[in-house]
């Protein structure tokens, strides 16, 4: 086969995104929560998911830890079921290159959910601006809502729900974002949440207000 595309072509579907959004009663979009580990991304995203679900909005939450259990499993996780060679080839670790691929895959999945008319909530450290921008560039303008959960490192270390900062400070793990690997804060996020001073529930309400203001959901939602 000499075709550079590998014979892969996009298959048009008879049910369009607009059809699905009309059926759902709201627009699809990606709400991309980014911030340091322990900043409150997952907590706030989960609250937003719950509030939207209660309002009858069709959503799906993609969480960094959960995705690492399957789609973006580590080499050691895959090796247990498929063998070491398979794990090395397809598993994702935490190098800069692997983190880039982690976010690329998530962006592609999120884009598919948007085409289904869903509001996709993603909670990932996603430390590199170029990777977040790459996801944004694949979506229609206005569909990517970057939410910076702006929590100081000191507070994140105090929370340290997974014990990662303690391990990083002790030299037990390397490549910890905020310690020995950089976090590039968003330059122009659609929304900034001060999770260090504002309760998570109030932060979640701020996200819902933004979605209403942008007419992604109805004012009454």
Task: Report each predicted region and the residues it spans.
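Extreme N-terminal, non-catalytic leader segments
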Residues: 1-30
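Hydrophobic anchor at the beta1->P-loop junction of P-loop NTPases
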Residues: 33
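The conserved Walker
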Residues: 37
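Conserved lysine of the Walker
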Residues: 41
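Conserved substrate/cofactor phosphate-moiety recognition/catalytic segment
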Residues: 46-108
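Glycine-rich phosphate-binding loop used to anchor ATP phosphates in small-molecule kinases
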Residues: 87-142, 165-166
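Conserved phosphate-donor/acceptor-positioning beta-strand/loop module used by diverse small-molecule
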Residues: 121-127, 139-159, 193
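Small-molecule kinase domains that catalyze NTP-dependent phosphoryl transfer to phosphate-bearing small molecules
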Residues: 150-206, 213-221
């Amino acid at each position: 086969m000499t075709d550079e595309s590998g014979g892969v072509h996009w298959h048009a579907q008879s049910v369009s995104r607009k059809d699905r959004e009309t059926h759902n009663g709201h627009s699809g979009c990606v709400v991309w929560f980014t911030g340091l580990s322990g900043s409150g991304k997952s907590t706030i995203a989960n609250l937003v998911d719950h509030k939207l679900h209660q309002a009858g909005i069709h959503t799906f939450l993609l969480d960094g830890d959960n995705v690492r259990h399957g789609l973006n499993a580590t080499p050691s996780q895959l090796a247990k079921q498929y063998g070491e060679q398979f794990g090395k080839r397809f598993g994702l670790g935490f190098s800069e290159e692997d983190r880039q691929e982690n976010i690329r895959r998530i962006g592609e999945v999120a884009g598919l959910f948007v085409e289904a008319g869903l509001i996709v909530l993603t909670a990932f450290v996603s430390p590199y601006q170029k990777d977040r921008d790459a996801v944004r560039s694949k979506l229609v303008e206005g569909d990517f809502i970057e939410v910076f959960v702006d929590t100081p490192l000191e507070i994140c270390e105090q929370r340290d729900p997974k014990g990662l900062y303690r391990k990083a400070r002790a030299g037990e793990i390397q490549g910890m974002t905020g310690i020995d690997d950089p976090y590039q804060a968003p330059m122009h996020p659609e929304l900034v949440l001060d999770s260090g001073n504002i309760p998570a529930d109030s932060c979640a309400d701020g996200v819902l207000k933004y979605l209403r203001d942008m007419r992604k959901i109805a004012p009454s939602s």
